[in-house]
Curated annotation (Swiss-Prot):
This is Cytochrome b. The gene is MT-CYB. Belongs to the cytochrome b family. Component of the ubiquinol-cytochrome c reductase complex (complex III or cytochrome b-c1 complex) that is part of the mitochondrial respiratory chain. The b-c1 complex mediates electron transfer from ubiquinol to cytochrome c. Contributes to the generation of a proton gradient across the mitochondrial membrane that is then used for ATP synthesis. A ubiquinone binds at H169. Binds 2 heme b groups non-covalently.
Amino acid sequence: FGSLLGICLLTQIITGLLLATHYTADTTLAFSSVAHTCRNVQYGWLIRNLQANGASFFFICIYLHIGRGFYYGSYLFKETWNTGVILLLTLMATAFVGYVLPWRQMSFWGATVITNLFSALPYIGQTIVEWAWGGFSVDNPTLTRFFALHFLLPFLIAGLTLIHFTFLHESGSNNPLGIMSDCDKIPFHPYFSVKDILGFMFMLLPLTTLALFSPNLLGDPENFTPANPLVTPPHIKPEWYFLFAYAILRSIPNKLGGVLALAASVLVLFLAPFLHTSKQRTMAFRPLSQFLFWMLVANLLILTWVGS
């Protein structure tokens, strides 16, 4: 899945650059500039659909990548694992600020709700929120800085990916049996390159199918309406890939408690290397651990469903 994530990142950066050339980071023009891109720019609709649905595939791949690492004990490469978790956090931040850019109903209210969570921090919370907003509400300054961040962060992700690679090459990669990988040290081309191309085909086929046939399947219908600060949508919710965390946030009646639980739901990944007690590295021969792992997967799926 690592190679697929690389392709995702490349696709997102290319489509994103093309979209940025037609985008206007201004509250009065953002929505219509996106509509203009879809209607009047050659293949603008395709570029936008690939960008929007590419994000979904990026998260599908990263969740599978993390799950696979969890199952096969890859977290014992501590540096590789920790840089990976930092990559996940950066990706989540990038997706969040990018979601706000078209300045639609759910974008606007999602940004308002999520940035407002920082106000739960004691003493400094309110100041941080107003500083992030650039005022007393989500408005033009917020949109401008979110665009700047959304442009910058993917390149930070690319840089972190190289660090991730460097640490991985220190140790060599893991395998399903959790034993030495020396026998896998074969020429990259044609062996691994052909294996990767198969993966690319398996990912790019559903991505193009989704982008061409039902590009709005995973989106929110509220997003066809331009942002209106005076009308709150009946239920505010993020994109599907954040629903598990959002469900955890919403299930706790206390604001600070919810924020801490939301943060913990992702940051708990940092603890994985310290919680490994087994003599065996992978779960391949540990039925009880396998059971707990699949319980975790089921739990996340149920949270995603409940969150919507």
